């Protein structure tokens, strides 16, 4: 086993995991679109998001200092949790490059650290497409990696598209005074995902190793139209309409995945 790095004082590295999760839906009528927004707004209100983030705190081994949460009118919610590190020695499972736990395997230590989540429901004014975006940031200062929370969070939301960024900033010193700008090995965010997640998504990496900057984009491979319909659309669409809606939804997902408008 690789020996642990002996530090001089506190580990001053800041590790930040930022990711955006998109859930896509089609509703046939304006009323159904509004009903979807209301449904998703209630499903992921501030109370539910607080519970999810509290689980994240448990996963990364942190101590909650303060929670601030807010539901917004007409829709949306946000939660911020301040966390602090306890003086413990991390286990190998906390720092090694491997997937974190799934929602049903959750088992409750970071100065200047926080977790935030914001939700953004959105409706296309013409095409009947609604998107629900969740932005989550997990920032830790110390030895614990926020990447351990990634696997759990992807399984907590209906994730059609996921964009993940991970960066390490600052430096810490060993007992001989030498600077270390990262304290763990990593070559891809994908290594922190479980096998079933890697199999379910088309993924692409853009990594800048010399800058300790890692980026992964994920697009769900399997497309089952029934999983994307809401309201009357689940029973009233003709075969031709279903083909048209399928094309619209796939086009919408590709535009979000590639972050650019694409010709139809």
Swiss-Prot record:
It catalyses: S-adenosyl-L-methionine + H(+) = S-adenosyl 3-(methylsulfanyl)propylamine + CO2. It comes from the Bacteria. Keywords: Autocatalytic cleavage, Decarboxylase, Lyase, Polyamine biosynthesis, Pyruvate, S-adenosyl-L-methionine, Schiff base, Spermidine biosynthesis, Zymogen. One of its GO terms (cellular component) is cytosol. Is synthesized initially as an inactive proenzyme. Formation of the active enzyme involves a self-maturation process in which the active site pyruvoyl group is generated from an internal serine residue via an autocatalytic post-translational modification. Two non-identical subunits are generated from the proenzyme in this reaction, and the pyruvate is formed at the N-terminus of the alpha chain, which is derived from the carboxyl end of the proenzyme. GO terms for molecular function: adenosylmethionine decarboxylase activity. Binds 1 pyruvoyl group covalently per subunit. It holds the Pfam family AdoMet_dc. It is an enzyme of class 4 (lyase). The modification Pyruvic acid (Ser) is found at residue 113. Belongs to the prokaryotic AdoMetDC family. Type 2 subfamily. This is S-adenosylmethionine decarboxylase proenzyme. The lineage of its organism: Bacteria, Pseudomonadati, Pseudomonadota, Gammaproteobacteria, Pseudomonadales. The gene is speD.
